[in-house]
Each structure stands twice: as C-alpha cells, then as structure tokens.
Amino acid sequence: VRFFATAAKGTEPALRDELRELRLPGVRADRGGVHFEGDVGHAARACVWSRVAARVLLEVTRFEARDGEALYEGVRAQDWTVWVTPQTTLAVRATCRSSQLTHSQFVAQKTKDAIVDLLRDRLGDRPSVDRDDPDVGVTVHLAKDQATVYLDVGGLSLHARGWRALAAEAPLRETLAAAILRLSGWDRERPLVDPMCGAGTLAIEGATWARKLAPGLGHARFGFERWASHDDVERRAMAELRASARAQALPAGPPVFASDVSPNVLALAQRNARAAGVELVLERKDVRDLGTTHPPGFVVTNPPYGERLDGDFALYDGMARAFKLLHGHTVAILAGTPAIETAMRRRPDRYWQLYNGPIECRLVVYSIE
C-alpha cells in the first residue's frame, strides 16, 4: 500500500529523514510531503512517532479525471464498504492544481456523492457528513487532470499534540517547530535555549524530542481506528504500539531554557510545558540581556516580525549583538523578514527556505566562534 505524509512547505527533507529513522519502507521526498510504503501498521507508527508530518494519507486509487463524470466514476469504482458504513460519518477535502476541474468544492462534492451513492445502492442506506470530526476523512488531490484519492490515517491534523492551552499571538505550529529543530542540527544533548519563547512551542518540542516522548500519544484515537476495516488484530497491535512508545520515554533530557519579556506568555509557556509533561527553565528576560550556558548551548528562536514587532527594529540589532557574544554556541533563527539577517551582519553557515503558514521565512544557522 502507498502512503503520503504531508509536511509544511520546505520541511520535506526533515520529514524524509525522520521517516527513515522510523525504518519505514520506500521513503521518498516529494513536493508537499514524503511517500512511503507498507501496511496500516507502518502508517500507525508514523502517526505515533512523527513530529514533522501534518497528515498521514493512505492512497486508495489514482485515475484521470478531466471532468466531473470521470471523477465520479473513478471514485465509485472503489469498494468503499471496506472502510465506510451507513453508521460512520464522512468528510471530503479536495485540492486542485493545473487541472480542468478547478473548483475544490465541486471536486469534494462529486467525490462524496460517488461514495454515498455506492453505499446506498449496496447497503440500502448512506453515511452522514461530519466536517468537524468525521470517522472517515477522504482527501482528493487533482494535479494535471490526475486524481489521487486518499484516506486520512491520522484523522485530526497531527500537529495537535494535546498540550497547547491557548495560542499566543502568531503561534508556531508544533510540526514546523519540530522541523526547525531537526534541520538546524540540534543533537538533543546540548542545552537548548529559546530567548523569545512566546507560548514555548520550540522549547517544548525540543524537550519532548530529547526525552523520546511520542507526539502521537496525545491522540486518543487516530482516524483509521474508526474505519469499518479496523479489527481486533489491529486493535491489539495499536495497544502494543502505544505501550511500547510509553516505555521508551526517558526520565530526563538536557536543560531547556525559555525566556521572554512578557510575563503573560511565560505563564502560557509554563502551562503548556506542564501539559506536555516536560520541564523548562523559564525566566523573564529581554533577548538583549541573554547570557551564555555551560556547556555552550544551542539557541533556536522565532523572533517577532510584522505586526508582532510593532515597528521595534532596534530589537534585531540588540539581538544580533547579544548573539555575537555567545562564543562556542550555535544560533538558529527563523527569520520572517530580511531585516533579521541584515542585523546579524554575516552570512549564515546553513539556511533553508520555509513557510510559517503563508509567510515565507528563512531558517538561518550560525556557528558563533
């Protein structure tokens, strides 16, 4: 069976490396995510352990769909009764790119019609639609008139770990934070420092990664556990997978320091860390007053920009001056504006182009001599 794990634009190499570490077969990076092969057990492992994947999708079928009729017939040709019954709820999402069918809503509607018509003809009744929390999530991706139809193995987006209370302004998605930590080269042994921590996402993701706390344990049930095909054999395998994941957790990791000027967001970071089951060394401090750690640490941060910055460009100069004093440290910055790199006044050792939602950013990494 073919699977596709989706990832934020630019983070595909991080997801590829992660899925290879999970020893999944046939791992291959592509635009928007990573392909792998195997069975539902392999996909379940990705759901429990992947920090970077947003969704894990099972490929049901692919076919040419130049018009609505071809799309309907292609979807209807599958035996959906394997996964869907009249008692289960259903939701369909669609994306269209470079195709004659351009309206994603039309594509989603046609796909849903094909599935419910098939069930009504076969079983005498049809499933109902639940867009918020469906038992079976179907995704259709149309590119160059080729339709690929997927089932959502994970269910709700995997970025939701279950620990986030309320988001501070402009929160960083957990999956993007995990990708930043992986791409920047943190070894999970050096002290980790986020001097502009906000709600604590980077610090918490770092602490949970270092302690091998499986991110998927925050999900009570994944999507495939609600499919009609989910049987006792799979249930036992899932119970074992979850028990094994819990047993691998380490009691402690390297120190993780998180600071911010706002007492309100620090309180939020504390609440989030507690919910995630990790300890952060929290301190109210301006980034311009940042000191060194012993041994030299790894600084990773997402400085404010745009509306969050409120026109305070002097912050970047002060931040850059503080970073230049961190001899022996590594500094990784998610730069949402070129002004951040300009303030650093040196070329980064490594960089990646990433997207924080719609915002184009550069992850820049500096080794401070």
Give the ranges of each region predicted by the language model.
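Accessory substrate-recognition/RNA-binding modules or partner subunits associated with SAM-dependent
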Residues: 2-136, 142-144, 153-159, 166-167, ...
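Short amphipathic alpha-helix with an adjacent loop that forms part of the alpha/beta core around
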Residues: 81-83, 290-295
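SAM-dependent Rossmann-like transferase core, predominantly class I methyltransferases
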Residues: 149-185
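Conserved S-adenosyl-L-methionine
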Residues: 172-291
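SAM-dependent methyltransferase catalytic-core segment centered on the flexible catalytic loop
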Residues: 213, 219-243, 294, 305-340
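Short SAM/SAH-binding signature in class I
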Residues: 296-302
